[in-house]
């Protein structure tokens, strides 16, 4: 059984300076994970494009400096020492749809930069968001589909599978996700148990569990018996099993309050309990 925790699960600790990518690796090892699902927010020194204007993001930006390569080598070495390979690198800020062609071009270059980073870490999967809005217009659809068609071959050259996630924008609607997946052979889905439009979650689960190549089993709140009180995680896992899911049981723990590490620990225990497996 493969088990992972997205590093976004520790974003509050990251924001206060109490966490970094090396602590994430250590925490995953302590929690008994078998792979690392890194969120690019945990690589702040590589994430400087927010301060750049779109016109300043030229193709050269996709290339990594000697210092950046050395930093990634350190991260990979730490992961190797912990016996943890990288799984899916979740990328924010390189989504495909923007109103402005200039912004689309800038995001394409950012995506190429993250392809290079994922390849350096040895990650087999990368999440690039669709963007857009839930009311996906034909123009949005065309831009998103064209963007994924353009991205997939470049990712494949680096041994990477591209995943979209039901995350935000157009991808919160099951009909949009299905339409995009059908239009882009080879595009995978990172299935998040949350994020769907509230009135479309059942349809989202039915779709997502059949297309999932990776998961974010999203947990928020636990009772004293260790049960998630807001989302039926056991049901989602059974649906995935019934659909023949073979990937890592990926967790995204987002506790509404309290200790992020303890919430992650409870999430891991819940997954083991559902599967009938013993924690490492």
Give the ranges of each region predicted by the language model.
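Histidine-acidic metal/acid-base catalytic patches
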Residues: 1-34, 149, 156-157, 170-280
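Short, conserved active-site loops that position catalytic residues or coordinate cofactors/metal ions
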Residues: 7, 36-41, 88-93
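A short acidic, helix-capping loop that chelates divalent metal ions and anchors anionic groups
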Residues: 12-14, 44-47, 95-100, 132-138, ...
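Glycine-rich, proline-tolerant flexible connector loops at the mouths of alpha/beta enzymes
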Residues: 37-75, 130-136
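Conserved residues at the C-terminal ends of beta-strands
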Residues: 39, 92, 129, 218, ...
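A short gly/proline-enriched turn/hairpin at secondary-structure junctions
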Residues: 40-42, 165-167, 254
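Active-site acidic/histidine proton-transfer and metal-coordination neighborhood
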Residues: 65-188, 198, 261-262, 278-279
């Amino acid at each position: 059984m493969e088990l992972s925790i997205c590093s976004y699960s520790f974003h509050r600790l990251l924001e206060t300076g109490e966490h970094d990518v090396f602590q994430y690796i250590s925490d995953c090892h302590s929690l008994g994970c078998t792979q690392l699902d890194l969120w690019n927010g945990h690589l702040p020194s590589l994430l400087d494009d927010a301060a750049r204007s779109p016109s300043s993001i030229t193709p050269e930006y996709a290339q990594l400096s000697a210092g950046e390569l050395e930093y990634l080598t350190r991260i990979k070495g730490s992961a190797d020492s912990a016996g943890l390979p990288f799984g899916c690198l979740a990328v924010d800020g390189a989504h495909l749809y923007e109103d402005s062609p200039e912004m689309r071009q800038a995001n394409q270059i950012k995506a190429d930069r993250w392809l290079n980073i994922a390849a350096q870490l040895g990650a087999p999967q990368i999440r690039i968001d669709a963007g857009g809005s839930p009311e996906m217009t034909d123009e949005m659809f065309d831009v998103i589909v064209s963007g994924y068609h353009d991205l997939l071959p470049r990712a494949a050259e680096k041994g990477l599978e591209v995943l979209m996630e039901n995350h935000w924008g157009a991808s919160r609607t099951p009909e949009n996700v299905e339409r995009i997946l059908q239009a882009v052979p080879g595009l995978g889905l990172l299935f998040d148990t949350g994020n769907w439009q509230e009135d479309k979650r059942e349809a989202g689960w039915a779709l997502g569990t059949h297309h999932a190549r990776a998961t974010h089993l999203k947990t928020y709140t636990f009772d004293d018996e260790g049960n998630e009180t807001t989302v039926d995680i056991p049901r989602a896992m059974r649906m995935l099993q019934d659909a023949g899911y073979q990937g890592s049981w990926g967790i995204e723990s987002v506790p509404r309050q309290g200790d992020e590490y303890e919430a992650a620990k409870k999430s891991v225990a819940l997954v083991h309990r559902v599967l009938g497996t013993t924690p490492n």
